[in-house]
Design a protein with these regions (language model features):
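Helix-biased detector of long, well-ordered alpha-helical tracts
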Residues: 1-192
Length: 192
């Protein structure tokens, strides 16, 4: 009998675009990518949907239904079953997704070793984009390109890397490439 590791990860995404359905899709994709980055296949998810408190309960309900539909469609596309969740209204909309996955061999970001190569499987720079958006800058074309890239699946790349025996993997998001690389190297007192 082959032992399978269970992996869990949780991630949250604020509304970077004005389409609650698309935010639901992106939130699920963002969460499963953390599981992929550990060499696992996602299986189940719990969701938390915070819709923006509106003057109209009808608008809140509509945003919730759209976000839930985006989460469900993305979960189906990635082979994930949503097994529960919660919803609420806040001053700022947000979706959080906890994903569980399974793998024969989990790969973590603390396994980097001297002599390892750095592979980057997608574009970088989203941290700068998010910081600009948080500061009130309008960057329409860049956000559209980010959405297109964010929807691409990295499942095959992560599975191949795990099979090939890589020592460490991570999903480059919140801390940017430099931040994640620094974190990965610090575990074993490595440098570039």
């Amino acid at each position: 009998m082959l032992f399978r590791s269970r992996i869990r990860s949780i991630d949250a995404l604020t509304h970077l675009v004005d389409d609650p359905y698309l935010v639901g899709v992106l939130a699920m994709r963002h969460a499963v990518s953390d599981v992929w980055a550990m060499g696992a296949s996602p299986t189940t998810a719990l969701t938390l949907i915070a819709v923006e408190r509106a003057l109209s309960q009808q608008l809140e309900a509509s945003d919730f239904v759209q976000a839930q539909a985006g989460l469900q469609d993305a979960a189906h596309a990635y082979g994930v079953e949503i097994v529960g969740g919660h919803s609420l209204s806040l001053n700022q909309p947000m979706i959080a997704v906890e994903v569980e996955g399974e793998c024969a061999r989990s790969v973590h970001k603390d396994g980097a070793m001297a002599g390892d190569e750095l592979w980057i499987t997608g574009p970088v720079g989203s941290g700068i984009l998010f910081a600009a958006l948080a500061s009130g800058f309008t960057i329409g074309a860049s956000i559209d390109q980010w959405v297109t890239n964010a929807l691409k699946s990295l499942f095959e790349a992560s599975q191949t890397a795990a099979r090939e025996g890589v020592n460490a993997m991570t999903d480059v998001t919140g801390f940017g490439l430099a931040g994640h690389l620094r974190e990965m190297l610090s575990w074993n007192n490595l440098d570039i």
